[in-house]
């Protein structure tokens, strides 16, 4: 299926796992075993999730190996309850990566003011990171520099940076979903056909415009001396994700 469908990796989140665990009896035996062993709810949840993620990493390992580490990653996010706690985010990211113990694992960290310092520190530890919740060009630029700072810190320790990968989950589709809704609301109260036509013409295009601006900023960054120095040591470029449409219309 991976080959036939061209699947190059998988992401996950607590909502996906909640739906899978609550709606599938295959987890019941492991849950009952955890209860019998006196494990807490969190311990049972993590044992189920870590196993699923580890198995997924193994399934996609051939993709990871065949592409030289460009594809084949499985993402798992740190608990949303610590999104505003840099230190906890760092420690949980390291704990997750150590517990699952797969080189094609990516840890999802939100690109918030508290999350970006964690991104740099986790990258410096040699852990792959998927930076999420990026909606603006500014947030993308900040993420790129956080990634670079993490690579620089690791290189300064004399450790390799050629096997570290990072993805910027720049949520293009969600921008259009929200902006289009605002445009639709405004169109109801506009009588001028010229103005209406201009607004209609913008629908579905704001996110792409945002991405084009971000790409120009990306080119400036990779043409700079700091990135060139890292690239010479084998650093991988920061990639995009989440460009697919979400508007059901």
Say what each PLM segment does.
Residues 164-172, 176-215, 219:
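A conserved active-site cap/scaffold subdomain adjacent to cofactor or substrate pockets
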Residues 13, 76, 122:
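Conserved, mostly hydrophobic/aromatic
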Residues 133-170:
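Catalytic or ion-translocation cores adjacent to nucleophile or general acid/base/metal-coordination motifs
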Residues 1-10, 15-20:
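An N-terminal structural lobe/cap that precedes and organizes the functional/catalytic core
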Residues 17, 26-107, 111-114:
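Active-site beta->alpha loop and helix N-cap motifs at the rims of alpha/beta catalytic domains
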Residues 104-112, 128-137:
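Catalytic beta/alpha-barrel core
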Residues 240-247:
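Conserved small/polar residues in nucleotide/adenosyl-binding loops
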Residues 6-7, 121-129:
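Glycine-enriched alpha-helix->loop->beta-strand junction motifs that scaffold or abut catalytic
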């Amino acid at each position: 299926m991976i080959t036939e469908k061209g699947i190059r990796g998988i992401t996950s989140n607590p909502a996906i796992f909640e739906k899978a665990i609550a709606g599938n009896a295959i987890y019941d035996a492991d849950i009952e075993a955890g209860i019998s062993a006196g494990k807490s709810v969190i311990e049972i949840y993590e044992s189920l999730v870590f196993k699923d993620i580890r198995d997924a990493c193994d399934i996609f390992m051939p993709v990871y190996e065949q592409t030289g580490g460009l594809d084949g990653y499985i993402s798992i996010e740190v608990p949303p309850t610590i999104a505003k706690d840099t230190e906890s985010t760092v420690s949980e990211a390291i704990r997750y990566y150590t517990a699952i113990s797969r080189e094609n694992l990516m840890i999802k960290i939100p690109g918030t003011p508290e999350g970006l310092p964690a991104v740099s520190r986790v990258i410096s530890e040699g852990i792959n990171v998927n930076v999420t919740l990026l909606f603006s060009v500014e947030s993308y630029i900040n993420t790129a520099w956080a990634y670079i700072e993490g690579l620089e810190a690791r290189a300064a320790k004399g450790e390799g940076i050629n096997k570290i990968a990072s993805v910027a989950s720049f949520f293009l589709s969600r921008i259009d979903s929200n902006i289009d809704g605002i445009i639709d609301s405004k169109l109801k109260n506009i009588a001028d056909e010229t103005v209406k036509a201009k607004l209609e013409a913008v629908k579905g295009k704001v996110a792409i415009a945002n991405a084009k601006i971000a790409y120009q900023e990306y080119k400036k960054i990779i043409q700079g001396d700091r990135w060139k120095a890292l690239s010479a040591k084998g650093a991988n470029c920061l990639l995009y994700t989440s460009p697919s449409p979400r508007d059901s219309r």
